[in-house]
Amino acid sequence: MSKRDYYEVLGVGRDSSERDIKKAYKRLAMKFHPDRNPGDKAAEASFKEIKEAYEILTDGDKKAAYDQFGHAGVDPNRGGGGHGGGDFGDIFGDVFGDIFGGGRRGGQRQAARGSDLRYNLELSLEEAVRGLTKELRIPTLAACDLCDGSGAKKGTSASSCGTCHGQGQVQMRQGFFAVQQACPTCHGRGKIIKDPCGKCYGEGRVEKSKTLSVKIPAGVDTGDRIRLAGEGEAGEFGAPAGDLYVQVSVREHGIFTRDGNNLYCEVPISFSKAALGGEIEVPTLDGKVSLKIPTETQTGRMFRLRGKGVKSVRSHAIGDLLCKVVMETPVNLSEQQKELLREFEASLTGAGASKKHSPKAEGFFDGVKKFFQDLNS
């Protein structure tokens, strides 16, 4: 009797993610689980078919072989020479691994460590500079609390696999070669679960969300990563959990930009303040401070406020705040103000006035004049 397509069994498309496949499996496994359908042979057969499809489609190598060769690519009974099936990567890996001492001799496959998780955390500049403790809600796979992660129904335990006799591997012939492969019955574990847990359906893990209090150190920046050991997904059947990596990104700020441990900002000043000098207030992350502006300050001049930047997350060094003053042209002038400016402009004209009061402009226009003279000569 021909087998149904594994994707059809689970009701998923060929481009479905592993997460979608897991969701489909859990929904169907709950529906057809023998504990929910006692004595129903059809439900039991459906459950076995669903479990088989799930095991193939969540194993990267087996899924690739199935996608390429169909059921023949994952049929453990198709071995002897020819291209009829089998996982060729595993076959040749075993052959050459044995020759060069690599191989997978020595018993059953160890239960897999849990997957690492990544959490993207966005912070304001103030939060990144000062540090804080954040409550993070993490969706993950946790050890099943009903079976304590064993996958077996409460009161039972996994039994030794009858196919490989607990070794996790079987010997198969490939033409002239006898090679070792992971046991197709227990998938290399050496044990099988005859009575799966009714909560995790033999997986030993369940989907769960947990809340963690994570301390974010002062001075972090976009691209920094914080590792929380053992806070990733639970491992298979009691294996160690993976790690959680918190990936930091810092939002753009309305006033400051950051470069390493230094902060930068632009501060507008009036024409009169730039010419006559005086004190202005500039913002810092700790509040406003006074900045003395010398007379005849030109727009674009940079002022450094030492120690007003960011404390390094990796040392005790503290950056600076660099303020660039930008002269702002007055707008919405009254007629009286315009007249005063005209009088002021007139006071700057005359022989030598431009050179005295605007040396850069004088030099610029002299250069322009010379440029056109050279062009026409």
UniProtKB/Swiss-Prot annotation:
Keyword Chaperone annotated: yes
Amino-acid positions noted as binding Zn(2+) 1 in the UniProt annotation, renumbered to this chain: C144, C147, C197, C200
Start and end residues of each J domain: 5-70
A GO CC term assigned to this protein in UniProt: cytoplasm
InterPro entries noted in UniProt: DnaJ (IPR012724), DnaJ_C (IPR002939), DnaJ_domain (IPR001623), DnaJ_domain_CS (IPR018253), HSP40/DnaJ_pept-bd (IPR008971), HSP_DnaJ_Cys-rich_dom (IPR001305), HSP_DnaJ_Cys-rich_dom_sf (IPR036410), J_dom_sf (IPR036869)
Origin: domain of life: Bacteria
GO BP term, example: protein refolding
Gene Ontology molecular function terms on file: ATP binding; heat shock protein binding; unfolded protein binding; zinc ion binding
Keyword annotations from UniProtKB, A to Z: Chaperone, Cytoplasm, DNA replication, Metal-binding, Repeat, Stress response, Zinc, Zinc-finger
Zinc finger (CR-type): 131-209
Residues annotated as transmembrane: none
Cell location: Cytoplasm
CXXCXGXG motif repeat start and end residues: 144-151, 161-168, 183-190, 197-204
Residues reported in the UniProt entry to bind Zn(2+) 2: C161, C164, C183, C186
Pfam family, one: DnaJ_CXXCXGXG
Cofactor note: Binds 2 Zn(2+) ions per monomer.
Cofactor: Zn(2+)
Subunit (UniProt): Homodimer.
Domain notes for this protein: The J domain is necessary and sufficient to stimulate DnaK ATPase activity. Zinc center 1 plays an important role in the autonomous, DnaK-independent chaperone activity of DnaJ. Zinc center 2 is essential for interaction with DnaK and for DnaJ activity.
Recorded family membership: Belongs to the DnaJ family.
Function according to Swiss-Prot or TrEMBL: Participates actively in the response to hyperosmotic and heat shock by preventing the aggregation of stress-denatured proteins and by disaggregating proteins, also in an autonomous, DnaK-independent fashion. Unfolded proteins bind initially to DnaJ; upon interaction with the DnaJ-bound protein, DnaK hydrolyzes its bound ATP, resulting in the formation of a stable complex. GrpE releases ADP from DnaK; ATP binding to DnaK triggers the release of the substrate protein, thus completing the reaction cycle.
Listed name of the protein: Chaperone protein DnaJ
